[in-house]
UniProtKB/Swiss-Prot annotation:
Function of the protein: May act as molecular guidance cue in cellular migration, and function may be mediated by interaction with roundabout homolog receptors.
The species this protein was found in: Homo sapiens
Range of residues in the leader sequence: 1-33
InterPro entries per UniProt: ConA-like_dom_sf (IPR013320), Cys-rich_flank_reg_C (IPR000483), Cys_knot_C (IPR006207), EGF-like_Ca-bd_dom (IPR001881), EGF-like_CS (IPR013032), EGF-like_dom (IPR000742), EGF-type_Asp/Asn_hydroxyl_site (IPR000152), EGF_Ca-bd_CS (IPR018097)
The name this protein goes by in its record: Slit homolog 3 protein
Gene3D superfamilies documented for this protein: 2.60.120.200, Laminin, Ribonuclease Inhibitor
Glycosylation sites: 72, 192, 563, 622, 784, 792, 797, 928, 1008, 1025, 1181, 1247, 1406
Main location: secreted
Occurrences of domain CTCK (ranges): 1449-1523
Localization, UniProt: Secreted
Length: 1523
């Protein structure tokens, strides 16, 4: 559904619900209330996708369907569904539910369908569904359930569909399914089940679907029954495979012979399990009824703990709240430690029922208040530590049940006072800590000093913080008479026993007694924190313009008088005075109010005086003062009232005085009633007078005769409603449509109560500011405009907005506060803009958002956009359409599915991206122009003198800018279009002297020398062996002055240069390298090798002798060090460890002497390793470990009659087996391996099956093959790539076959568990190096090996140089194409001529250019051939020289791949499908298919799955009536 229609649908549903509610009022009892934010229709309650954290209250008792899916509910309590006796369908899927209290469903007697999938349930409580006998469908899939207790499903005997797949189930207790006799569908796939008891499925006679695949079944003698059971029911339990023992791994359970199901012991008992024993939370440890979760990084209290625990330790975590009933079910708890967390919220019943609890430790948290009743019932508690929190008050009955408490610590909190009697219940208290609290030692704390003097139990030294006279003095040592109250202190702390400490006087205000005076302080809003004791609030003479509905008066029960005179109030929001029932006097004199109505004064039920003097009120209507029945004095003096409608004062039943003076009354027929009313009531102050018509001017209204109140030519009334729909728009109820009207601003006359506004397809360049006044809007469509920028708080007043459509505009930047205030927004569409980045925090206020459209935006996915990736993944609010555009490694990746760690910042961000939020950063203003941001034009330039234009690039005097290049002279000229002409120096030409003619076109360079163009000349670059200005002289490199051979080497002249014949001991092209003969020396006993020319000598340690120091001195041990006789290979270093020699291997080598090379790194483009062939037995496997960050490549390849390939494809491992006698078979791994870490890959061949196992996960099988795949003697194995000469000739190629080699590391290759040694690399294995490190020398290109230890770089387009670090020069710069376009061809260019021109430089005009003017093409277009002749290119369905003949209706067969989208996976047919297209003429009829048939095709998907679908194919075409 499109976002725009979603809003319409919501409006229709809302109106339908309203109509149903009205019908209910007229025809029966009053409608039942609906929970806040939910939608109720008939017996259905829809609360899905609202971000709810708990089940809402107030669900109608008659509800039959309840949708609570896609919220954030974490716990289901006993009271959540109490009383819902008619409920039949309950949806709770896709929440965060981890705990369901026993008895949560006890009232749901009629429940038939319950969905709890996609939650976080770990344990299923027994007897949970005992009270839901009519349940027929139960979905518990995609949770974290670990075990199924015996009584889990007791009571639901009618259930037909039970889904338990995709959990962590490893234990199913005996009898768990015994009562489910009507069960038809049971899903247990994708769990951890290893054993199933023989009685599990015996009581399911109606079972027709059973899924057991993707488990860990152990096929021993105890599972033999399942094989028989499945063989008798071939349609159920398909693909159920054995995972152990090893010799049965991958076999179908039903296909294994009974004799193979054996146990080690002949009479072993079937293993049993206990579902409750596995309920210890995964990060914790459980032993001796103690649960230890210390320092595990927990964010919440673990659920489903072992029921018999006596102690739980949760300190040093990140827990923020203790939910309701968190520990209630653990009745044996004695000790709870939750110290050093982040707890700020504790439910009142968190510790309810813990009568055995003796120790409760809560120190080091962020607790600000102890809720009422938190410690009630903890009669055994002896230790309570509340220190190091932020507790600011304690109710007098907080500790009422703690008679046995010995130690109480309130040290280091925010307590200012303590209520008298707080410690009275603590009969056993021995130690009390109160220090480090900011105590206010006034009259209310006098009792504490007396208490501590009588009971010296406070040992921490509690002191006063204020007042100053008592600051820093010990409370227990201060005399009672010094504790006294003064000023407003008594009001502030009077109710401290109820945890109420009144607020201090607001900033900028003055408080005296109960008067709060905030007048004349330039305030723009009412202070948000006012003391509760205030009775007189003075806010006059400020700058308040709008009275917001903040609920401030609900907190002021003592308020009697409000003075808001002399402000700038233009609007009073509905509900602004809610809770102000005690207010008796309201002054609004001297403001700018134009209209008022009864809803404005809602809440002022006790108001007696209302002053509205000196405002701009023009009309008093029937509802202006509705609800003000207590008002006695009303002043409307000095307004602009011209009309008062009859009955305007009827609701003012207590009115005794009204002032209507100084108003311009229009005494026409609309005011005739007022004169009679004034004469009758006699409560008016003064005599209000007429101002219109002229003949009644200044006459008192009550004196005007009734016949003089006429409307002849004077029907004006200020109370008449203005038109409710703008001219350019159409309106229906509260929906206004102004689409495609060419609007550049919001039209005037927009109804204030509009709920849906459609402004798409106009020319708006910014979001109209006037929209902020339309507070009832629920949908705004601003798509297909020209809006280029949003501002902060653009939509902050639109609290009801649920749909905002900004697609297909020119948005480049999203300010961080642009969407602030949109807490009701559910759909936000930003599709099709130019947004590259979204600042973190932009969506903080979008708490109700369920759909975000960000597609077709050039997102720059670096580390600054990582938060958005995490946010999108957490809530699945973006449907997987938004793609990254940059940086290059992230291009075309999906925002939803790309791993978060790939969002990285590397190097500076392109200035064009940064400048989207500040266009001035790209320095668009030239010639020292000053740049300023502009919300419409993006930027504006203030140009210096002599320049003009948008970017200050146009000179007022064209020659000031020196447009002539290369020293040309500028001349002002009116005859040229640019206003100037250039006189060029010798060697340059062109309008601006920008062209350097190519002097090499006619050069005299000889011997294939390269000509380099200069300025009016050229230079010849000679090849080797030639010199001279024209390279016409041969060089003799062996003459003494040119001989480059070093170290007495012999120079030998060659045809193309020379070579050096080195003397022994030297090497290199010029014999420049002195060979180090010590590289392979044989010096022993630690002797030092000294290199000499063509040899070396050994410098022996003292006492040793011989050429190689091989003779030890007499009378000494031959071995002075264990390493002396221990030779490490491959350059390894020998070290002594515990008196034993040990080799420290270089990267990639292993073995006792580092003799084996087990890790190699593939860095070249065509790198590979060839392994010697070995016959693989019928039971064999190949395993290896890989590490890479690339998406594609060849891991392993076997080429013979049965080609086999193990490939890296889009980050997954793909196994392809291509027997030439059958279609190729492919299987994909679920796991991705391109994260740079090592992953294990195993290929198992067993009994004509081929299985792929990645990271020891679930095997992926190719199924039963026609014959056993094997690696023959003559079929080599290639790792990391294949020889370029071999290609993939033996393996049939598909469109997605990765032809490139593998880039990364391969480690520990084993064939039949035999570790392979890479040490003797074949000579063709180029670009393969020991160890694991990547080739990084090529800056902008790929490595390609040329020698064993050498690589060359293949550069990406636009880069050149040996290391691809030089930006390539565009060969088209300075091109000489006259009438054509320059096209680069490598380092040169060619000219693509315009029509009518030819030649190498497009400088020859063809005479046939206008030949098409006389050559008519009836159904096609005329073109000129290469020979200059005209010809017709016909439209489809026509032929002939002039396209005059209509082709008959025929079918043309094309072959192409058919594609389908399946979720987030893209699927395509395995081969191209022949498709017939009908083309040709049929006169008045149409060329259409006349016969077709359907055929099944196999579709393969990118996620590794496949499916079969029927596709319709056309067979014949003919002429039929057009449909």
């Amino acid at each position: 559904m499109a976002p725009g229609w979603a809003g319409v649908g919501a409006a229709v549903r809302a109106r339908l619900a309203l109509a149903l509610a009205l019908a209910s009022v007229l025809s029966g009892p009053p409608a039942v209330a609906c929970p806040t934010k939910c939608t109720c229709s008939a017996a259905s309650v829809d609360c899905h996708g609202l971000g709810l954290r708990a089940v809402p209250r107030g669900i109608p008792r008659n509800a039959e369907r309840l949708d609570l899916d896609r919220n954030n509910i974490t716990r289901i309590t006993k009271m959540d569904f109490a009383g819902l006796k008619n409920l039949r369908v309950l949806h709770l899927e896709d929440n965060q539910v981890s705990v369901i209290e026993r008895g949560a469903f006890q009232d749901l007697k009629q429940l038939e369908r319950l969905r709890l999938n996609k939650n976080k349930l770990q344990v299923l409580p027994e007897l949970l569904f005992q009270s839901t006998p009519k349940l027929t469908r139960l979905d518990l899939s995609e949770n974290q359930i670990q075990g199924i207790p015996r009584k889990a499903f007791r009571g639901i005997t009618d259930v037909k569909n039970l889904q338990l797949d995709n959990n962590h189930i490893s234990c199913i207790e005996d009898g768990a399914f015994r009562a489910l006799r009507d069960l038809e569908i049971l899903t247990l796939n994708n769990n951890n089940i290893s054993r199933i008891l023989v009685t599990s499925f015996n009581h399911m006679p109606k079972i027709r679907t059973l899924r057991l695949h993707s488990n860990h079944l152990y096929c021993d003698c105890h599972l033999a029954w399942l094989s028989d059971w499945l063989r008798q029911r071939r349609t159920v339990g398909q693909f159920t495979l054995c995972m152990a023992p090893v010799h049965l791994r991958g076999f179908n359970v039903a296909d294994v012979q009974k004799k193979e199901y054996v146990c080690p012991a002949p009479h072993s008992e079937p293993p049993s399990c206990n579902a409750n024993s596995i309920s210890c939370p995964s990060p914790c440890t459980c032993s001796n009824n103690i649960v230890d979760c210390r320092g595990k990084g927990l964010m919440e209290i673990p659920a489903n703990l072992p029921e018999g625990i006596v102690e739980i330790r949760l300190e040093q975590n990140s827990i923020k709240a203790i939910p309701a009933g968190a520990f209630t079910q653990y009745k044996k708890l004695k000790r709870i430690d939750i110290s050093k967390n982040q707890i700020s919220d504790i439910a009142p019943d968190a510790f309810q029922g813990l009568k055995s609890l003796t120790s409760l430790v809560l120190y080091g948290n962020k607790i600000t208040e102890i809720v009422k009743g938190l410690f009630d019932g903890l009669v055994s508690l002896q230790l309570l530590l509340l220190n190091a929190n932020k507790i600011n008050c304690l109710r007098v009955n907080t500790f009422q049940d703690l008679q046995n408490l010995n130690l109480l610590s309130l040290y280091d909190n925010k307590l200012q006072t303590i209520s008298k009697g707080l410690f009275a219940p603590l009969q056993s208290i021995q130690t009390l800590h109160l220090a480090q609290n900011p105590f206010v030692c006034d009259c209310h704390l006098k009792w504490l000093a007396d208490y501590l003097q009588d009971n010296p139990i406070e040992t921490s030294g509690a002191r006063c913080s204020s007042p100053r006279r008592l600051a820093n003095k010990r409370i227990s040592q201060i005399k009672s008479k010094k504790f006294r109250c003064s000023g407003s202190e008594d009001y502030r702390s009077r109710f401290s026993s109820e945890c109420f400490m009144d607020l201090v006087c607001p900033e900028k205000c003055r408080c005296e007694g109960t008067i709060v005076d905030c007048s004349n302080q330039k305030l723009v809003r009412i202070p948000s924190h006012l003391p509760e004791y205030v009775t007189d609030l003075r806010l006059n003479d400020n700058e308040v313009s709008v009275l917001e509905a903040t609920g401030i008066f609900k907190k002021l029960p003592n308020l009697r008088k409000i003075n808001l005179s002399n402000n700038k109030i233009k609007e009073v929001r509905e509900g602004a005075f809610d809770g102000a029932a005690s207010v008796q006097e309201l002054m609004l004199t001297g403001n700018q109010l134009e209209t008022v109505h009864g809803r404005v004064f809602r809440g002022l039920s006790g108001l007696k005086t209302l002053m509205l003097r000196s405002n701009l009120i023009g009309c008093v209507s029937n509802d202006t003062f509705a609800g003000l029945s207590s008002v006695r004095l009303l002043s409307l003096y000095d307004n602009r009232i011209t009309t008062i409608t009859p009955g305007a004062f009827t609701t003012l039943v207590s009115l005794s005085t009204i002032n209507l003076l100084s108003n311009p009354f229009n005494c026409n027929c609309h005011l005739a009633w007022l004169g009679k009313w004034l004469r009758k009531r006699r409560i008016v102050s003064g005599n209000p007078r007429c101002q219109k018509p002229f003949f009644l001017k200044e006459i008192p209204i009550q004196d005007v005769a009734i016949q003089d109140f006429t409307c002849d030519g004077n029907e004006e009334s200020s109370c008449q409603l203005s038109p409710r729909c703008p001219e350019q728009c159409t309106c229906m109820e509260t929906v206004v449509r102004c689409s495609n009207k060419g609007l550049r601003a919001l039209p005037r006359g927009m109804p204030k109560d509009v709920t849906e506004l459609y402004l798409e397809g106009n020319h708006l360049t910014a979001v109209p500011r006037e929209l902020s006044a339309l507070r009832h809007l629920t949908l705004i469509d601003l798509s297909n405009n020209s809006i280029s920028m949003l501002t902060n708080y653009t939509f902050s007043n639109m609290s009801h907005l649920s749909t905002l459509i900004l697609s297909y505009n020119r948005l480049r930047c999203i300010p961080v506060h642009a969407f602030n205030g949109l807490r009701s927004l559910r759909v936000l569409t930003l599709h099709g803009n130019d947004i590259s980045s979204v600042p973190e925090g932009s969506f903080n206020d979008l708490t109700s958002l369920s759909h975000l459209a960000l597609g077709t935006n050039p997102l720059h996915c670096d580390c600054s956009l990582r938060w958005l990736s995490e946010w999108v993944k957490a809530g699945y609010k973006e449907p997987g359409i938004a793609r990254c555009s940059s940086p290059e490694p992230m291009a075309d990746r999906l925002l939803l599915t790309t791993p978060t760690h790939r969002f990285q910042c590397k190097g500076p961000v392109d200035i064009n991206i940064v400048a989207k939020c500040n266009a001035c950063l790209s320095s668009p203003c030239k010639n020292n122009g000053t740049c300023t941001q502009d919300p419409v034009e993006l930027y504006r330039c203030a140009c210096p003198y002599s320049y003009k234009g948008k970017d200050c690039t146009v000179p007022i005097n064209t020659c000031i800018q020196n447009p002539c290049q290369h020293g040309g002279t500028c001349h002002l000229s009116d005859s040229h279009k640019d206003g100037f002409s250039c006189s060029c120096p010798l060697g340059f030409e062109g309008q601006r002297c920008e062209i350097n003619p190519d002097d090499c076109e006619d050069n005299d360079c000889e011997n294939n020398a390269t000509c380099v163009d200069g300025i009016n000349n050229y230079v010849c670059i000679c090849p080797p062996n030639y010199t001279g200005e024209l390279c016409d002289e041969v060089i003799d490199h062996c003459v003494p002055e040119l001989n480059l051979c070093q170290h007495e080497a012999k120079c030998i002249p060659l045809d193309k240069g020379f070579s050096c014949e080195c003397v022994p001991g030297y090497s290199g092209k010029l014999c420049e390298t002195d060979n180090d003969d010590c590289v392979a020396h044989k010096c022993r006993h630690g002797a030092q090798c000294v290199d000499t020319i063509n040899g070396y000598t050994c410098t022996c340690p003292q006492g040793f002798s011989g050429p190689f120091c091989e003779h030890p001195p007499p009378m000494v041990l031959l071995q002075t060090s264990p390493c002396d006789q221990y030779e490490c290979q491959n350059g390894a270093q020998c070290i002594v460890v515990q008196q034993e020699p040990t080799c420290r291997c270089p990267p990639g080598f292993a073995g006792p002497r580092c003799e084996k090379l087990i890790t190699v790194n593939f860095v070249g483009k065509d790198s590979y390793v060839e392994l010697a062939s070995a016959k693989v037995r019928p039971q064999a496997n190949i395993s290896l470990q890989v590490a890479t960050d690339k998406d594609n490549g060849i891991l392993l390849y076997k080429g013979d009659n049965d080609p086999l390939a193990l490939e890296l494809y889009q980050g997954h491992v793909r196994l392809v087996y291509d027997s030439l006698s059958s279609p190729p078979t492919t299987v994909y791994s679920v796991e991705t391996v391109n994260d740079g870490q090592f992953h294990s890959v195993e290929l198992v061949t067993l009994n004509q099956t081929l299985n792929l196992v990645v990271d020891k996960g679930t095997p992926k099988s190719l199924g039963k093959l026609q014959k056993q795949p094997a690696v023959g003697i003559n079929s080599p194995l290639y790792l990391g790539g294949i020889p370029t000469s071999t290609g993939l000739s033996a393996l049939r190629q598909g469109t997605d076959r990765p032809l490139g080699g593998f880039h990364g590391c391969i480690h520990e290759v084993r064939i039949n568990n035999e570790l392979q040694d890479f040490k003797a690399l074949p000579p063709q294995s180029l670009g393969v190096s020991p160890g694991c490190k990547s080739c990084t020398v090529c800056k902008h290109g790929l490595c390609r090996s040329v020698e064993k230890d050498s690589v060359v770089c293949e550069c990406r387009p636009g880069w050149t140089g040996p290391l691809c670090d030089q930006e390539a020069r565009d060969p088209c710069l300075g091109h000489r194409c006259h009438h054509g376009k320059c096209v680069a061809t490598g380092t040169s260019y060619m000219c693509k001529c315009a029509e009518g021109y030819g030649g190498d430089l497009c400088d020859n005009k063809n005479d046939s250019a206008n030949a098409c003017s006389a050559f008519k093409c009836h159904h096609g277009q005329c073109h000129i051939s290469d020979q200059g002749e005209p010809y017709c290119l016909c439209q489809p369905g026509f032929s002939g020289e002039h396209c005059q003949q209509e082709n008959p209706c025929l079918g043309q067969v094309v072959r192409e791949v058919i594609r389908r989208q399946k979720g987030y996976a893209s699927c395509a047919t395995a081969s191209k499908v022949p498709i017939m297209e009908c083309r040709g003429g049929c006169g008045p009829q149409c060329c259409q298919p006349t016969r077709s048939k359907r055929r099944k095709y196999v579709f393969q998907c990118t996620d590794g799955s496949s499916f079969v679908e029927e596709v319709e194919r056309h067979l014949e075409c003919g002429c039929l009536a057009c449909s």
